[in-house]
């Protein structure tokens, strides 16, 4: 899409991780030729450089993907982290990155996990750990450095939780393990979240696979884009143990999914400029006022766990008995696997569309929604 005039990055300091030990001839400077086209994602960019190099920028942090057989430019800005292909033995801490990597056939590049086997809802990831192909190397705040170093880890993929323990990031980098902090959860559009598959395609040399996977995902919901809104309203929520309702902000990707499915999110006007969180806790009284007349209730099981019956829901919040959706029997619970299955968001959109357009869809035919009876 957009193309930038070629220019050379200025030389500041030699990067600490510059490939001094690489035998291939080095180029002196990095020349940007174009901007890699992204249709939806806003939280990362990729500059395509001469010689097959790719310069990734995420929230001000820069990463240079160096093709196999090449070396990093000699005069490279000191803030740029070098990622030498093939990138192998990845320590994958951000669980939402696993599904895109699996979808492009890149699971073999992952050697270490920040999630234990029993906590994976992705069959391929769980099986790989059970078979010893991927080892548990500790969660983001307490990594097993010995395991990570013995595995010759080529990259740690973290999410922004790592900023709560910056000393861990610093220690990994001190040991020579580059750290990439992904921000897909900050994307406000479901298609933007899925487009992060292209970043993993670039890292793993599987760009064509990533583009094909993303295009297929977009095509799955393409028929809905020509449909008229259904007029149905919906709330997406959970009830906390301290009697608050957790709802998504109006600009969140879940609200966008409800819209793509033909519905209208009842808290579309809810904003909170005080933080970057996608969710906000509101009082049950405020939830009652905003969602009592919603046509559909969608209970988010990710945090508080799955519900199986209407009685379980009413036990958590008896006042829901007054809600229109409860009385009409249009209350649905998401599966707990939803967060990890980040490339399957089109299926949730299609599920929602069936709930909005059919009187009583068979939940055995839905992927992520189960009806509460």
What are these regions (language model features)?
Residues 1-15:
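Sec-dependent bacterial lipoprotein signal peptides
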Residues 142-153, 282-293:
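Short helices/loops that flank or line small-molecule/ion binding pockets
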Residues 187-205, 209-215, 296-373:
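Structured C-terminal subdomain patch of bacterial secreted/periplasmic proteins
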Residues 88, 96-98, 113-124, 164-167, ...:
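Extracytoplasmic ligand-binding site segments that recognize negatively charged/polar headgroups
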Residues 246-280:
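Alpha-helical, coiled-coil/dimerization segments enriched in small aliphatic residues
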Residues 54, 58, 63-149, 155-161:
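A short, structured surface patch at a secondary-structure boundary
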Residues 17-98, 209-236, 360-373:
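Bacterial Sec-exported substrate-binding components of ABC uptake systems
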Residues 89-92, 109-113, 155-159, 179-182, ...:
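Structural recognition of the beta-strand scaffold that forms the well-ordered cores
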């Amino acid at each position: 899409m957009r193309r930038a005039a070629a220019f050379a990055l200025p030389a500041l300091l030699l990067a600490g991780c510059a490939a001094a030990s690489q035998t291939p001839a080095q180029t002196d400077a990095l020349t940007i030729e174009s901007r890699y086209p992204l249709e939806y994602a806003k939280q990362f960019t990729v500059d395509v450089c001469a010689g097959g190099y790719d310069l990734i920028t995420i929230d001000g942090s820069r990463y240079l993907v160096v093709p196999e057989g090449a070396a990093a430019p000699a005069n490279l800005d000191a803030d740029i982290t070098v990622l030498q292909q093939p990138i192998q033995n990845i320590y994958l801490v951000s669980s939402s990155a696993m599904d895109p990597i699996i979808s492009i056939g890149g699971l073999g590049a992952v050697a270490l996990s920040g999630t234990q086997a029993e906590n994976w809802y992705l069959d391929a990831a769980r099986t790989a750990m059970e078979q010893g192909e991927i080892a548990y190397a500790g969660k983001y705040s307490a990594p097993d450095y010995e395991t990570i170093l013995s595995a010759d880890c080529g990259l740690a993929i973290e999410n922004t939780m790592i900023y709560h323990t910056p000393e861990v990031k610093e220690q990994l980098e001190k040991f020579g393990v580059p750290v990439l902090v992904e921000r897909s959860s900050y994307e406000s559009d479901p298609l933007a979240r899925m487009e992060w598959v292209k970043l993993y395609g670039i890292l793993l040399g599987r760009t064509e696979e990533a583009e094909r996977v993303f295009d297929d995902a977009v095509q799955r919901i393409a028929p809905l884009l020509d449909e008229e809104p259904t007029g149905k309203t919906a709330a997406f929520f959970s009830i906390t143990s301290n009697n608050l309702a957790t709802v998504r902000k109006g600009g969140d990707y879940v609200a966008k999914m409800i819209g793509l499915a033909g519905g209208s999110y009842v808290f579309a006007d809810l904003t909170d400029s005080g933080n970057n969180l996608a969710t906000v806790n509101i009082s049950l009284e405020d939830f009652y006022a905003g969602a009592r007349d919603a046509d559909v209730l969608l209970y988010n099981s990710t945090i508080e766990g799955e519900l199986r019956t209407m009685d379980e829901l009413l036990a958590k919040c008896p006042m829901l008995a007054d809600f229109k959706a409860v009385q009409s029997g249009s209350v649905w619970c998401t599966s707990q696997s939803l967060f990890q299955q980040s490339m399957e968001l089109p299926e949730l959109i299609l599920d929602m569309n069936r709930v909005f357009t059919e009187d009583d869809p068979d939940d055995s035919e839905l992927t992520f929604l189960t009806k509460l009876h």
